[in-house]
Amino acid sequence: MKLSMPRFDQAPVLVVGDVMLDRYWHGATSRISPEAPVPVVRVEQHEDRPGGAANVALNIAALGAQALLVGVTGRDEAADSLANSLKAAGVDARFQRIDSQPTIVKLRVMSRHQQLLRVDFEEPFRTDAAALAVDVESLLAKVKVLVLSDYGKGALQNHQVLIQAARARNIPVLADPKGKDFAIYRGASLITPNLSEFETIVGRCADEAELVAKGQALMSELDLGALLVTRGEHGMTLLRHGQPALHLPARAREVFDVTGAGDTVISTLAAALAAGEELPSAVGLANLAAGIVVGKLGTAAISAPELRRAVQREQGSERGVLGLEQLLLAIEDARAHGEKIVFTNGCFDILHAGHVTYLEQARAQGDRLIVGVNDDASVTRLKGVGRPINSVDRRMAVLAGLGAVDWVVSFAEDTPERLLEQVRPDVLVKGGDYGVEQVVGAQIVKAYGGEVRVLGLVENSSTTAIVEKIRQKG
């Protein structure tokens, strides 16, 4: 799937649901309490982060989209902390404050990046559902997507009023469901249960085929536009009417904490759809975003630059013609898997059998082969007027089609030295009958511990000779 970064700055989203404050106490523990067999934590640092629906809104704002939030809090210090954090992040938050009940707070005691204890301060809210619906309806004209972030804490009392109000305005409704009754989300454009939540409703799924069949039945029963089941290390499965199931593998490199991963999924989906992305592409972006956020500790948001890097890395993992930034990310990924990077360069104006043999030999020097290609202006400077015969785009396209070549990148200078300083290959390869020290860029590569190898040329294979022969016949 080809992914690209949406214009999130043109993506207003309204989030309605259960807001809460995630509070963290970080400290050191080196002894057991004499009062009970529990560790003693000496608190050194504390921090507050928006949680629940507030984290969804925070994630949307972090991507550069406009986030509006409607929720319910107490009238207390925790609500003030939540409001201040959201305001600083650019979230337009509208809270229904209740005097008689506290803001929901999840306190986590941490030591050495490990969670030792969680303490919940909460009571189910007795929400003024009618007033909340009025607030939501007054904001729908300003947004392109409505998100229902339901944690079952009482902020959402009448889901159907909100869903129907949005549908009447042709605004997609995304719901992150909770509980044992998904009928309350009837008519939603998309719901995003995790596998456990999904199986609570439909029963255990023995395999993907059963998951798909039960998911399609649920969609029909509840008049859902689509269903996205998040499946942890097994990725995500998107179901749509009349379309084959789309299974996306998990993209996490390392998993430190899954807290808030569901919030990240629905927030990225909402922002991408509001920015005009088609649903499969939005799901692909959400899958990448989830892979990033589980690598962070605690409730966290991802930024637009982080997602952009992930998109570029995803495209860079494919073989073919890449820009420099994509190439560097692809190299980073390859090295993370212990792969040896080989680099060679040239004009490759008219690709011939000698080139093919040489590139196959170059590829055999390592695991990944990068081919640097002189752009048109540098070929003209090196080869003279009338060259290149083929434009740089055509030359790179032909090279990218060879099985021996992983990545192709162009450079504007006459030599690849500047490119070598950025790419830093493990092996620099050149074809010819000269010594290693005569290879352009050899000193750069050897300075950081890389290798330089010279391969023999295939006899009777010369682009210049081929060009001259064509001209004589013409």
UniProtKB/Swiss-Prot annotation:
EC assignment: 2.7.1.167, 2.7.7.70
Pathway connected to this protein: Nucleotide-sugar biosynthesis; ADP-L-glycero-beta-D-manno-heptose biosynthesis; ADP-L-glycero-beta-D-manno-heptose from D-glycero-beta-D-manno-heptose 7-phosphate: step 1/4; Nucleotide-sugar biosynthesis; ADP-L-glycero-beta-D-manno-heptose biosynthesis; ADP-L-glycero-beta-D-manno-heptose from D-glycero-beta-D-manno-heptose 7-phosphate: step 3/4; Bacterial outer membrane biogenesis; LPS core biosynthesis
Coiled-coil annotated residue ranges, if any: none
Chain residues that bind ATP: N194, L195, S196, E197
Pfam families documented for this protein: CTP_transf_like (PF01467), PfkB (PF00294)
GO MF annotation terms: ATP binding; heptose 7-phosphate kinase activity; heptose-1-phosphate adenylyltransferase activity; phosphotransferase activity, alcohol group as acceptor
Keyword Cytoplasm found: no
GO cellular component: cytosol
Residues that span the membrane, as ranges: none
Region of interest called Ribokinase, as start-end residue ranges on this chain: 1-318
Active site location: D263
Catalysed conversion reaction: D-glycero-beta-D-manno-heptose 7-phosphate + ATP = D-glycero-beta-D-manno-heptose 1,7-bisphosphate + ADP + H(+); D-glycero-beta-D-manno-heptose 1-phosphate + ATP + H(+) = ADP-D-glycero-beta-D-manno-heptose + diphosphate
Example GO BP: lipopolysaccharide core region biosynthetic process
Domain of life, per lineage: Bacteria
Keyword Nucleotide-binding attributed: yes
Subunit structure as annotated in this protein's UniProt entry: Homodimer.
Protein role: Catalyzes the ADP transfer from ATP to D-glycero-beta-D-manno-heptose 1-phosphate, yielding ADP-D-glycero-beta-D-manno-heptose.
NCBIfam families: cyt_tran_rel, PRK11316.1, rfaE_dom_I, rfaE_dom_II
Family, as annotated: In the N-terminal section; belongs to the carbohydrate kinase PfkB family. In the C-terminal section; belongs to the cytidylyltransferase family.
Protein name: Bifunctional protein HldE
Organism: Pseudomonas aeruginosa (strain ATCC 15692 / DSM 22644 / CIP 104116 / JCM 14847 / LMG 12228 / 1C / PRS 101 / PAO1)
Gene from which this protein is expressed: hldE
